[in-house]
């Protein structure tokens, strides 16, 4: 929270707002499929006094809810291509599946790009910051590789 002369404000950074969206998407991955309207209504319930939602976040969730299945398909297809590339290039099999947090971070980035046309370098850098926030150093490479090709 930012401190002002008058006291506390509830200004959140864009990264903190992205983290809130990633956490929402992550929690939702366990309960898919859902209708777009239901997902958007669920997000409104995610609003808290400490972390109030804004229109910027709502547009990201709207883009996510309307494109979830096509985004998931793109992620799966790109992950398979990446694994084949590793196998061809290094002659080793990468059986590592994409984890749910990485999926949520990538879905958030794809949704933000769709909703706000945010540029690729910023989205990748923010995604890596979010992975650091959750101490997911090992998954950062995978996240970066996916976003680099999907955005």
Swiss-Prot record:
It comes from the Bacteria. This is Uncharacterized protein MG027. The lineage of its organism: Bacteria, Bacillati, Mycoplasmatota, Mycoplasmoidales, Mycoplasmoidaceae. Pfam families: DUF1948.
């Amino acid at each position: 929270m930012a401190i002002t002369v008058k006291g506390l404000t509830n200004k959140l950074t864009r990264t903190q707002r992205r983290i809130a969206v990633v956490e929402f998407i992550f929690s939702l991955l366990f309960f898919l499929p859902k209708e777009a309207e239901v997902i958007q209504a669920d997000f409104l319930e995610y609003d808290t006094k400490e972390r109030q939602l804004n229109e910027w976040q709502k547009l990201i969730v709207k883009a996510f809810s309307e494109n979830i299945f096509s985004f998931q398909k793109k992620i799966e297809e790109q992950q398979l291509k990446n694994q084949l590339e590793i196998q061809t290039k290094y002659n080793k099999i990468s059986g590592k599946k994409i984890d749910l947090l990485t999926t949520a971070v990538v879905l958030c980035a794809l949704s933000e790009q769709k909703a706000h046309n945010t540029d690729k370098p910023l989205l990748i850098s923010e995604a890596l910051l979010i992975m650091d926030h959750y101490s997911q150093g090992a998954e950062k490479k995978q996240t970066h590789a996916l976003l680099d090709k999907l955005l």
